[in-house]
Amino acid sequence: MDTSQVRILPKLDISAGHNFTKPSKRINESQDVAEFLSSKAYVDLMTFLLQLNRSLFPTKLPDGRVLTWELNSEAVEYSAPVRQLQQLLSKLEAILDEAPPDTGPRRFGNISFRRWYEMVESRAASLLEECLSKEILQMPSSDPGAPTAEVELLAYFLGSWGSPQRLDYGTGHELSFLAFLAGIWKLHGFPENSPGVEERAIVLGVIQPYLELVRTIIKRYTLEPAGSHGVWGLDDHSFIPYIFGSAQLAPAISESDRIPEEGSLSDAPAPGGVTKANVVERERKHNLYFSAIGFIYDVKRGPFWEHSPMLYDISGIQAGWAKINKGMIKMYNAEVLSKFPVVQHFPFGSLFSWERDPNAPSPAADAHIAATTRRTDEASTSSYLYSPKYIKATSWSYGSYKGALGNISTRWTGSPWRFYVCRPYANESSVG
């Protein structure tokens, strides 16, 4: 596949004129999710996610050598915008000292999180001005009465840290941070570079530090999971480290290769290593997937299969990390982007538009489908994301599970996404 055909999130054509607008809520009921999945915002978010995902696959050089992209890799160079975002995260971490956890009795999250969030909210504009370029923040609208780009970036930035009302954090907040970075990308905030170079720096230099800060916040203020499936969800709070971390351990690719669907890097730890504390402790310093697993070990007690059954099931997959990566992207579509409790608070402006994408298929006749997604393979045609699949989760039936935790007695043998039933459009083949 020609690298020119790899989909990249388009940047704004400033010369063509553009009007920014304050992002607002558009997903008010479950039926609105289908509209979201046909929107320009959905396409842009998935394009950026897949763009970042591809950059984390090990790189096969023409001379046969393989470059891997571990956490803290010296081979990854951080551009000035990435370093500025790192400074932004450091400033947010410093504000934690100004809001020590409340020592009084509580049933759920610590109310001091509200104080921390209020401080961040009151300083957000100045923080962005200190750490982002003026050209980005003050990019004007064509209409003199319309706001600058700052109003849109600010909305996604503030949506990235959890809910001060509910004292929770979840994948919807994680999605908001992804949108914040994608918005900067669309505004030409990251430099032009060779394919994958800046994307890797964004993941390893910004997203991973963001995840680490969020984990500190969760532990410090005992934030509840937001929009979680409980024990039957992948993770209480995050999803994207499992996508990017599995990519880090997949087979190496050249610039012209398609993303592999099976296999692993030759010296990658086995997926089953997540159940072994010593392996997790060793690998969490190098890999996003194991870093996320390590946080689970930090905050949960008891057998891994009991508190993280979905991840335990995935650990038994024999087809390698590329298979896991593919499944994670499917699951992200179905369990994050297609779930009303997760995306209901995502706001839409001009950078992430509620407007229908011209390549989107007609809405499904069945408005009550529980989860809706589209094929996420890299594509070389204008129909990139539009091999539409409507996916519905069947009842969970793992091993001898009967509906209560105590009834699990056998290790599951299938990948969790095999329990999604695909109903393809027209003559489209079903998701693999």
From Swiss-Prot:
The keyword Repeat appears for this protein: no
GO BP annotation list: autophagy; DNA repair; G1/S transition of mitotic cell cycle; mitotic spindle organization; regulation of transcription by RNA polymerase II
Uppermost EC category: isomerase
Superkingdom assignment: Eukaryota
Pfam families reported in the protein's UniProt record: PTPA
Catalytic activity annotation: [protein]-peptidylproline (omega=180) = [protein]-peptidylproline (omega=0)
Subcellular location: Cytoplasm; Nucleus
EC number: 5.2.1.8
Record flagged with keyword Isomerase: yes
Swiss-Prot/TrEMBL keywords: Cytoplasm, Isomerase, Nucleus, Rotamase
One Gene Ontology cellular component annotation held by this UniProt entry: protein phosphatase type 2A complex
Molecular function GO terms recorded: peptidyl-prolyl cis-trans isomerase activity; protein tyrosine phosphatase activator activity
Main subcellular localisation: cytoplasm
Function: PPIases accelerate the folding of proteins. It catalyzes the cis-trans isomerization of proline imidic peptide bonds in oligopeptides. Acts as a regulatory subunit for PP2A-like phosphatases modulating their activity or substrate specificity, probably by inducing a conformational change in the catalytic subunit, a direct target of the PPIase. Can reactivate inactive phosphatase PP2A-phosphatase methylesterase complexes (PP2Ai) in presence of ATP and Mg(2+) by dissociating the inactive form from the complex.
Family according to the record: Belongs to the PTPA-type PPIase family.
Name of this chain's protein: Serine/threonine-protein phosphatase 2A activator 1
Organism annotation: Emericella nidulans (strain FGSC A4 / ATCC 38163 / CBS 112.46 / NRRL 194 / M139) (Aspergillus nidulans)
